[in-house]
Swiss-Prot record:
Pfam families: Cpn60_TCP1 (PF00118). Its EC number is 5.6.1.7. This is Chaperonin GroEL 1. Gene3D superfamilies: GroEL, GroEL-like equatorial domain, TCP-1-like chaperonin intermediate domain. Keywords: ATP-binding, Chaperone, Cytoplasm, Isomerase, Nucleotide-binding. ATP binds at residues 29-32, 86-90, 413, 477-479, 493. Forms a cylinder of 14 subunits composed of two heptameric rings stacked back-to-back. Interacts with the co-chaperonin GroES. One of its GO terms (molecular function) is ATP-dependent protein folding chaperone. InterPro entries: Chaperonin_Cpn60_CS, Cpn60/GroEL, Cpn60/GroEL/TCP-1, GroEL-like_apical_dom_sf, GROEL-like_equatorial_sf, TCP-1-like_intermed_sf. One of its GO terms (biological process) is protein refolding.
């Protein structure tokens, strides 16, 4: 395909136009008085949202240079959303301000590389101040306040705080659509996976159709079991210990399954057999997780362990196991705390190194099952449009609350950046164009507060000047128009959100400023219509039939 190339100022201005179109659409949503944006969908009802990344994803531009500029800013929003779950609009507003101020200096003859270095040093200094001023979250109320701001709903904030309190910061909180109106929280105790008993004969509670084993041994096998001879040695040892047995294997069939069922019916031996969760490498990993959690080992020929010779020392233990027809829950596995911690850190590093969203999600689920627990928030609404929007808000608020627990909180409302900047720039000693680069950051960090004030119908410059003179942590409550102690009023942002927004915006701004040429696909001319007369022009696309 033919390419078109733009150089120098033309290239940079083309990118900036794309950035501005996207940023102008996104920034109207910033702050408590921000507006919504309606997104048309090819199929189904339109989506109404005030989420920056959702709006950014929908914007496609015709001009090839503008399109590239918009795509670069989408990356800022997406990366901030992935890392922190919020701050996408703040990141976009910061990127726009940095690029605008930066290009003005490049056009005036400043060296782009020196500007970039100055921007990086200033951002590093501001980030250090943000982290130093962060306040650790200690109470459920503080988590609720943070989540409420992200979701724009106090009830959602309280529910997320409750969920985080129960599952811990490593736990997984998933959001599902509900057929009923309102919100509901469902908690899972212990490790749960989506495989139930192989046969209903294993049921111990006929009314609830579930098998409950107290203080059982757990046999974990990475292969099929069909021959009863393989099981005999283990079964005898477990029977002598007078404890029940949970068997997790690729499959259990034939006489091996029949023997377990007969012994259960006769009442001589209580056991339950379930299939291992997952497939392929994911199954191996999940079995290893279960083994570490319960203090057992995966019996597999790959590691030289055979079922026929397995002793009790290879079996896991738990306080309780509950098995239904669809899922198995292991409560309080007897695994070694250090080994579990090691496994958790291994999974965490896999999450950081993974490029796939799907893999990351699955790894996060495994991490939660080992380190915390799983909570499900079920959300309902009157219409499909409202339900989609509500579900998305809750998902963002969950990530926001987790970010707050992780690194702490700072004053919200765009104030933390301005106040951290005041301290950072007082100690920053730079010269020449690097100092100019730092000044670009000094100007740009006012942008989020200015936009919040503008969206609230206030004069941005006046608000920023007023905030500069206030004590640390004090600023504008845009919802009421009053100047208050923001942290005390529950108006806060996770420092991870503010930090990520600034760092990601600066990263893209540096790319804009140091761009000297843009190569884009040449737009194709529209193919001529294939219809006949004027009145049939709309049928041109039917020519292929």
């Amino acid at each position: 395909m033919a390419k078109i190339i733009a150089f120098d100022e033309e290239a940079r201005r083309g990118l900036e136009r794309g950035l501005n179109i996207l940023a102008d659409a996104v920034k109207v949503t910033l702050g408590p008085r921000g507006r919504n944006v309606v997104l048309e969908k090819k199929w189904g009802a339109p989506t109404i949202t005030n989420d920056g990344v959702s709006i950014a994803k929908e914007i496609e531009l015709d001009d090839p240079y503008e399109k590239i500029g918009a795509e670069l800013v989408k990356e800022v929003a997406k990366k901030t959303d992935d890392v922190a779950g919020d701050g996408t609009t703040t990141a976009t507003v910061l990127a726009q301000a940095l690029v605008k101020e930066g290009l003005r200096n490049v056009a005036a003859g400043a060296d782009p590389l020196s500007l970039k270095r100055g921007i990086e040093k200033a951002v590093e200094a501001v980030t250090a101040e943000l982290l130093a001023s962060a306040k650790e979250i200690e109470t459920k109320e503080e988590i609720a306040a943070t989540a409420s701001i992200s979701a724009g709903d106090d009830e959602i904030g309280a529910l997320i705080a409750e969920a985080l309190d129960k599952v811990g910061k490593e736990g997984v909180i998933t959001v599902e659509e509900s057929n009923t109106f309102g919100l509901e929280l469902e908690l899972t105790e212990g490790m749960r996976f989506d495989k139930g008993y192989i046969s209903a004969y294993f049921v111990t509670d006929a009314e609830r159709q579930e098998t409950v084993l107290e203080d059982p041994y757990i046999l974990i096998v990475n292969s099929k079991i069909s021959n009863v001879k393989e099981l005999v040695a283990v079964l005898e040892k477990v029977m002598q210990s007078n404890k029940p047995l949970l068997i997790i294997a690729e499959d259990i069939e034939g006489e091996a399954l029949a023997t377990l069922i007969v012994n259960k019916i006769r009442g001589t031996f209580k056991s339950v057999a379930v299939k291992a969760p997952g497939f392929g490498d994911r199954r191996k990993a999940q079995l290893a997780d279960i083994a570490i959690l319960t203090g057992g080992q995966v019996i597999s020929e790959e590691v030289g362990l055979k079922l026929e010779t397995a002793g009790l020392e290879l079996l896991g233990k738990a306080r309780k196991v509950v098995v239904t027809k669809d899922e198995t829950t292991i409560v309080e596995g007897a695994g070694d705390a250090d080994q579990i911690a090691g496994r958790v850190s291994q999974i965490r590093s896999e999450i950081e190194n993974s490029d796939s969203d799907y893999d990351r999600e699955k790894l996060q689920e495994r991490l939660a099952k080992l380190a915390g627990g799983v909570a499900v928030i079920k959300a309902g609404a009157a219409t499909e449009v409202e339900l989609k929007e509500r579900k998305h808000r809750i998902e963002d608020a969950v990530r926001n609350a987790k970010a707050a627990v992780e690194e702490g909180i700072v004053a919200g409302g765009g104030v933390a950046l301005i106040q951290a900047g005041a301290k950072a720039f007082a100690n920053l000693q730079l010269e020449g164009d690097e100092a100019t680069g730092a000044n670009i950051v000094r100007v740009a960090i006012d942008a989020p507060l200015k936009q919040i004030a503008f969206n609230a119908g206030l004069e941005p410059g006046v608000v920023v000047d007023k905030v500069r003179g206030l004590p640390a942590g004090h600023g504008l409550n845009a919802a009421t128009g009053q100047y208050v102690d923001l942290l005390a009023a529950g108006i806060n942002d996770p420092v991870k959100v503010t930090r990520s927004a600034l760092q990601n915006a600066a990263s893209i701004a540096g790319l804009f400023l140091t761009t000297e040429a843009v190569v884009a696909d040449k737009p194709e001319k529209n193919a001529p219509a294939m219809g006949g007369g004027d009145d049939m022009g709309g049928m041109g696309g039917m020519g292929g039939f």
